[in-house]
Amino acid sequence: MVDETLPTGLCAVLITNNDRSMVTDLLAANAYKIDHLKTPKIWSLVEKATCFYVGGYFLTVSPPSAMLIAEHALAKGKPFTLNLSAPFIPEFFKEPLMSLLPFTDVLFGNETEAQSFAKSLGYETSDLKEIAKRVCELPKSNSKPRIVVFTQGSKETIVATGGKITSYPIIPLAKEKIIDTTGAGDAFTGGFLSQYLLNEPIEKCVAAGNYVACQVIQRDGPSYPNEPHSFKF
């Protein structure tokens, strides 16, 4: 999308020890409209796609666009996946989030996002396993079991699906090797989906996600090593 009246959006990332904070100015990104999605050039790409991933941040910009994608995914039997992205999304954008949830086959989030979501739903618990279980059981538009995935940084990854809750270990990494955690959550999601789309078991999806995230946090910015990986999933 090109908006002649606005510059490209900006994001400043501030690194403090092993943590990071982001300051954004969406600018042109905040002007996205469903009409752009419906253009023949863009919609033809939607029709060719076999899976969809929507970040929660997009719900602040164009919820109708996200809903159109979700409805297409449901009608065509394509996976639709969603990331909570930030604690303020379920807090201030609960309505569009809950509208998309019935279409969501895989929901991603970290521990603070999960707890914010639980609070917005009125759950009186901060236990991630219980939150994952309850979210997994919320109404769904098709019969395919929802998968809820909550990461916790250096702690285990929690997955709920089909009434079962499982914890998966992360890849241990010495603190001094952590350079920049920017993009770790997105890296995990990409790694997970790379195996999910190959119909691999969940444990392999989680292992791939944790591996890619582990690689990213050892580098400056959301970047990846050039050499082929040697990790055995």
Q: Could you tell me what each predicted segment is?
A:
Residues 140-146, 154, 172-233:
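Conserved post-catalytic alpha-helical subdomain immediately downstream of the catalytic base
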Residues 1-167, 171, 222, 226-233:
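Ribokinase/PfkB-type carbohydrate-kinase core domain
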